[in-house]
Amino acid sequence: MASVVDICNLALAHLGDNATIASIDPPEGSAQAEHCQRFYPIARDTLLEMHSWSFSTKRAYGAEVENTWSMWEYAYAMPNDASDIIAVIPPEARDDYSTTFTPETYPDFYTNYSPSVAAGQYVPQKFAVETAADGSEIILTNQKQAVIRYHAKITDPTKFSPLFTITLSWHLASMLAGPVIKGDQGAAEAKRCITLMNLYLGKAMEADSNARKIKPEHIVSWIAGR
């Protein structure tokens, strides 16, 4: 698996650089290493936000905290490593797409009843992410014993898929082109790198999506109503 330095050197190689940096934390002293130290975290984090990558998707039981808002029944602490929330689901749901909803697992079963709910099809649980009085982020929802699905802040490059790594190298190269090459040539090179980044991004997203084979479970309403 590629290291952070490997990804940085790959990005520099895309620009025709010698690509021989040995460290960016701390930077070894070269201008290239300093540029990589500045831009690598930005490139990584923005690319992580572009897709629901399977390697960054986690689920955890919500840790209930004090709820001071009457319009929501429950409040849960934001997972420490979460960057954003994907879904709030009942504890027995295998995925976001289907579960057998009952008055116990779906708080709005009666007030928002519909055939899709009775048939066991996925109905997203409403939630809001807000900041509590103490400055901590909390998740507000009506779901009891909620399971939180979220995107984690992934900094370990060994967790990245190979296509994500290649995409990240081109994304980083587009940011390095200006300070490394400079001028109009640097701007033109940045555009070339963005084009190739988008090409590999599509391939990476397709491969990542193919890794998930979730089929919504259909339960006819007369069975669900038993």
Annotate each predicted stretch with a short phrase.
Residues 2, 31-34:
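Alpha-helix capping and helix-loop boundary segments enriched in small/acidic/polar residues
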Residues 6, 17, 25, 45, ...:
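Acidic-enriched, low-complexity/disordered segments with a strong bias for Aspartate over Glutamate
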Residues 21-30, 37, 41, 45-49, ...:
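Intrinsically disordered, low-complexity, basic-enriched segments
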Residues 1-25, 225-226:
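Short, intrinsically disordered N-terminal pre-domain segments
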Residues 34-115, 121, 125-127, 160-176, ...:
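Divalent metal-cofactor coordination and adjacent catalytic microenvironments
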Residues 7, 12, 111-226:
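Internal mixed-charge
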